[in-house]
From Swiss-Prot:
GO CC term (a single one): plasma membrane
Pfam families found in the cross-reference section: Dicty_CAR
Assigned protein family: Belongs to the G-protein coupled receptor 5 family.
This protein's encoding gene: crlE
Protein name: Cyclic AMP receptor-like protein E
Membrane topology: Multi-pass membrane protein
UniProt organism field: Dictyostelium discoideum (Social amoeba)
Transmembrane intervals: 11-31, 41-61, 86-106, 117-137, 157-177, 214-234, 275-295
One of the record's GO molecular function terms: G protein-coupled receptor activity
């Protein structure tokens, strides 16, 4: 039985993720300038995270606490495959953002829009290949009991673990390099040239603000996934857990060892791991909320709200008072 606090935390994380993703998506389509900004690429991982939240949410209505629906083997495996695909795609999009940051640091004349087709091919194609490869052992060893498998899926564990660690390290290294270039002022000003010194300086300032936001998105994802990665490694390394499902063998062990002393010990350990896994899922979902907070710092977004009187009076009162004084003189 999961503790009430971990269950509530997971539910709160899911709701905040939903709010954050809808906030980004809504403003992306509402404000045209956001669709032409360097930070427009964040819309793709936002859609992915929203879909992940929706697909994983039915675990709340399951009779037994688990990451996956337990009503049928087919539905459970399909849900698990979608979740695996979405997490991989989310990470690859974060790598694409990091690659853009490297271009901003080292290739000032590069047109980043030309890379988007390649980004789409990698972000949607590579996860599909990984899911197909890692699901084959599950099809062979499936015991027909709702995502419970007879043996650990070594291919899935090692392949995903290596990929996730590599993606996270790459994102952190790029963030460090980008921060170094921001401090030194070695960033691309614009895709076009100009003879106006003032215009160039404005472009530099704007680019720096966008880059600061861009480098936060991959870092937020990597930080939010660290706990899940560590627990997945621990879970796989213990004899009580396999990689076929998040809590697969733990629940079976509870049923088999219910009346034994060793069973009680296993139950306590498994329950503790289940709580941590639920908490790690909640932390991962908070990525959507944190991304929305970063997105809120967009000058294009804030400029649009400044044009709305009620928001200008509440959040930019000084500017509203200054405008009123000018209107009075005029």
């Amino acid at each position: 039985m999961l503790s009430l606090s971990s269950y509530v935390l997971n539910l709160v994380g899911s709701i905040l993720c939903l709010i954050g993703c809808l906030f980004i998506i809504g403003h992306f389509f509402w404000i045209p300038l956001l669709r032409t900004s360097l930070s427009r690429i964040i819309i793709y991982p936002t859609f992915i995270l929203l879909l992940y939240d929706m697909v994983s949410f039915p675990s709340f209505i399951s009779k037994t606490a688990d990451l996956y629906i337990e009503r049928s083997t087919i539905i459970c495996n399909f849900q698990e495959a979608i979740i695996q695909y979405l997490i991989l795609s989310n990470f690859i999009w974060s790598v694409c953002i990091s690659v853009n940051l490297l271009y901003l640091c080292f290739s000032p004349n590069k047109n980043l829009k030309k890379n988007e087709l390649l980004y789409h091919l990698c972000s949607w194609g590579i996860p599909l290949i990984v899911v197909v490869i890692t699901k084959i052992p599950n099809m062979i060893s499936d015991n027909g009991n709702q995502c419970r498998f007879k043996s650990p899926n070594y291919i899935k564990f090692y392949l995903e673990t290596i990929l996730f660690i590599a993606f996270m390290l790459f994102n952190f290294i790029v963030a460090f390099i980008t921060i170094k270039h921001i401090i030194s002022g070695n960033l691309r000003e614009s895709e076009t040239t100009t003879t106006s010194v003032l215009f160039v300086n404005e472009k530099k300032i704007t680019t720096k603000k966008i880059v600061w936001r861009l480098l936060l998105y991959p870092s937020i994802l990597s930080i939010c996934y660290i706990m899940t990665l560590v627990l997945s490694i621990y879970q796989f390394s213990t004899e009580s857990y396999g990689s076929g499902g998040a809590y697969a063998n733990s629940i079976n062990n509870k049923r088999n060892d219910k009346n034994t002393e060793s069973g009680n010990s296993n139950n306590n350990n498994n329950s503790y791991i289940e709580i941590l896994l639920y908490i790690s899922k909640a932390i991962f979902l908070l990525q959507g909320f944190f991304n929305a907070l970063v997105y809120l710092r967009s000058s294009k977004l804030r400029d649009r709200y400044k044009k709305i009187t009620i928001f200008r009076k509440i959040f930019w009162r000084d500017e509203a008072d200054y405008q009123s004084i000018n209107d009075g003189f005029n």
